[in-house]
Amino acid sequence: MFVYNLNLYKNETLMKKKYNYQILVVILTLFLGLTKRVYAQQSVSFNSPVNTKTRPVELQLKKTYELEKAGVSASNEFDGARLSDFILENDSTATVIIKPENSPINNSGYYAFKTWSSSPKPFYFTFHYPKGYKHRYIPKLKINNNWTAIDPTFIYRKDSIVTIKLNLSKDPILVAAQEIQSSTDVKNWYTNVVAGKEYVTVKSAGNSVLGKNIPVLDIYKGDKKNKKIIVLLTRQHPPETTGYYAFQSFLETILDDSELSDVFLKTYRIIAFPIANPDGVDLGHWRHNYGGIDLNRDWSVYNQPEIKQIVKFITTASEDDEGDIILGLDFHSTTKDVFYTNKKRDNTSMPNFIDYWFAGLERNIPGYKVNESSGNSQEPVSKGWFLYGHNAVGITYEIGDATPKEDIVIRGQVSAKEMMKILVYIIKP
């Protein structure tokens, strides 16, 4: 009897050890998986850190302003609007007050409002900005659903003060710093572009501060395992629609089902973010998100949910599918066409890509000369994140505020084709 109990005890002890071992294996597996996920969002160091903790923003009062004495109205009651106040100066002129969401802030004095009158008349609008800021954008007009730049003879400048003349009627005219491309407009565009293309999956990186979707287009043919990754970004800064148009043209070219595109997408994977800052876009912000931060300074510690979730999506895709991130293109707008590049290229994913790419642009766009500004990123911007975080090529692709749309389309098309040619035929995976 005693021997039987001893054997039973030994068996129970062995079973407990085996059970404890299995638990240990499960714990280690979970820990390693968690470690991997934490690693995916590790911060990237920059020489000049920027405080990107949330700051308050000033929301504009959404309303229709009625100047009864003049019979003129103006409204900011639509997505992408920016009108802080509307004040009658005399029977033919009103002051348009434009304030940013907070400050300090880049001089990107964005405005957008609808205006109309009770009877046909010419009327003048004088723009007023806070001290230290001045008028940047040539007004664009949306009349009968068509956008056009204002007639230059209807713009009057006195020192830094800008006044415009509009011929008003009961039919509203939409006046904006740049053509409006709200989050709804962006969704309508990419939904139409990817329709019928089974190799494109529309996903979500997460939600903005206000709960708006941050869409992602995941693009590849065949198995995504081990495919090298190219990341495309735009609309970190709300008013920068000319950069967004280049992004559109670039992506549409990749999705044009050409022979080149087919070979490219069987070899590489595109992860594209068509609107990184949906809150800022729809609120008519000059530059920041609803957290009051320039998102293109948050690529180090990811204090803002938009960048945190974009980074998580990119790095998780790279790790889960064992695909190296080799190139990041971030589409923006500024006062002129320019490519901001990193000086460091040796020992990166593609040391010669930029030289090949720029040569291809100049060779295939008549009369075009690349404007490059090269410098390793000191502040936490996306192009620096690609370099310092992934040893990848990072480029900020800037289009001028007033670059004609037909030129933007051509540059987007050619730059996409040249990228695909280089990656398929010259720099092979």
For each feature predicted by the language model, list its residue ranges.
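Extreme N-terminal flexible tails
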Residues: 41-169
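Short secondary-structure junctions
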Residues: 149-153, 198-204, 366-376
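Extended acidic/polar, glycine-enriched regions
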Residues: 156-198
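Active-site-adjacent mobile loop/cap segments within catalytic or ligand-binding domains
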Residues: 180, 296, 337-348, 373-429
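Active-site/substrate-binding loop(s) of hydrolase catalytic cores
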Residues: 199-215, 219-220, 224-363, 367, ...
